[in-house]
Swiss-Prot record:
Reaction equations catalysed: L-methionyl-[protein] + a quinone + H2O = L-methionyl-(S)-S-oxide-[protein] + a quinol; L-methionyl-[protein] + a quinone + H2O = L-methionyl-(R)-S-oxide-[protein] + a quinol
Keywords, in A-Z order: Metal-binding, Molybdenum, Oxidoreductase, Periplasm, Signal
EC category: oxidoreductase
InterPro entries for this protein: MsrP, OxRdtase_Mopterin-bd_dom, OxRdtase_Mopterin-bd_sf, TAT_signal
Entry EC no(s): 1.8.5.-
Signal peptide: 1-44
Residues noted as binding Mo-molybdopterin in the record, renumbered to the chain: 88, 91-92, 146, 181, 233, 238, 249-251
UniProt family annotation: Belongs to the MsrP family.
Subunit comment: Heterodimer of a catalytic subunit (MsrP) and a heme-binding subunit (MsrQ).
GO BP: protein repair
Protein name from the UniProt record: Protein-methionine-sulfoxide reductase catalytic subunit MsrP
Length: 334
């Protein structure tokens, strides 16, 4: 990993920005409630032009002990904590970007159980404390690219997924890794009400090929900005795969299962022509309803000050991950 090769100063979200929520924008534009149940990126271009002042506070989780390996650090200013904790997609708590911060306090994250099962020789169960104590934690500054064509730069804290999988000892039959979010409708209003939850089928599920899961970049994430993850960011543990669109970063994980067959994934089930299994960041493969050739940085100004820059293949991590897809048609396997 070459230090600082993926980021430049313009990548970093400025301090003053925070956008109006999706529901406020859609209501103002006369878009019906039924339209809110469409796949989450449908109205992204509308949302991104507005900003408001109802920014929630930065996360106040428990401080974590972690190292800062030089390979994953840089000297650039970061997207401020209140932006990462206040501008989220977590449909279990609502469709608006501010809904997770407003509603996720109902999620009980301790006690917690994460089970690793399936095609493994040694099934494992981790509790809440294991998530921050079982493996050495490290801070990694990654670019985060949403399928909605906006991005942030975030200092995540966690451990490589391959270390956890190695303890479980995948069998020779294991080809994929399936992930599942907690199902707790009494705590997650979006799991109770299809209009709050975007019409998705819950619990949220995701998947990777085994070689993707074992890649050193793939991070089991338990913290951000030096502290334990806040609920709206996927506490107590979420997945970060920095070369893929953000919806692959499943939150509040309770199950990891190694499988022989490719597992179903939530957004691919909801709209298979729009959200593929791989979901690699690719400027040459557009979403059916908007271009992915450029991305919008959440800047400090208003509508006239929004800046774009070219989207990087694999979100700038091509040197590390392109070999995983050698011989694969990335347009067909999007």
């Amino acid at each position: 990993m070459k230090k600082n090769q993926f980021l430049k100063e313009s990548d970093v979200t400025a301090e003053s920005v925070f956008f109006m929520t999706r529901r406020q924008v859609l209501k103002a534009l006369g878009i019906s409630a039924a339209a809110l149940s469409l796949p989450h990126a449908a109205h992204a271009d509308l949302l991104s032009w507005f900003k408001g002042n109802d920014r929630p506070p930065a996360p106040a989780g428990k401080p974590l002990e972690f190292s800062k390996p030089a390979a994953w650090q840089n000297d650039l200013p970061l997207t401020p904590a209140d932006k990462v904790s206040g501008y989220n997609n977590f449909y279990e708590f609502g469709l608006d970007k501010a809904d997770p911060a407003a509603n996720a306090g109902s999620l009980k994250t301790d006690p917690w159980t994460l089970k690793i099962s399936g095609e493994v020789a040694k099934p494992l169960t981790l509790d809440h404390d294991d998530l921050t104590r079982r493996f050495p934690l490290e801070e990694r500054i990654y670019r985060m690219r949403c399928v909605e064509a906006w991005s942030m730069v975030v200092p995540w804290i966690g451990f490589p997924l391959h270390k956890l999988l190695a303890l479980a000892e995948p069998t020779s039959n294991a080809k994929y890794v399936a992930f599942e979010t907690i199902y707790a409708p009494e705590q997650m209003p979006g799991q109770q009400d299809r209009f709050i939850g975007g019409g998705l089928k819950y619990p949220y599920v995701e998947g990777l090929r085994l070689d993707e899961a074992m890649h050193p970049l793939t991070l089991m994430t338990v913290g951000v900005y030096g502290k334990a993850l806040p609920p709206q960011n996927g506490a107590p543990v979420r997945l970060i795969v920095p070369w893929k669109y953000g919806f692959k970063g499943i939150k509040s994980i309770v199950s990891i299962k190694l499988t022989r067959e490719r597992p179903p994934t939530t957004w691919n089930l909801a709209a298979p022509d729009e959200y593929g299994f791989y979901a690699n960041v690719n400027p040459h493969v557009d979403h059916p309803r908007w271009s992915q050739a450029t991305e919008r940085f959440i800047g400090s100004g208003g509508i006239l000050d929004v800046q774009r820059q070219p989207t990087l293949l694999f979100n700038g991590y091509a040197e590390q991950v392109a070999s995983l897809y050698r011989g694969l048609d990335l347009r067909e396997n999007f």
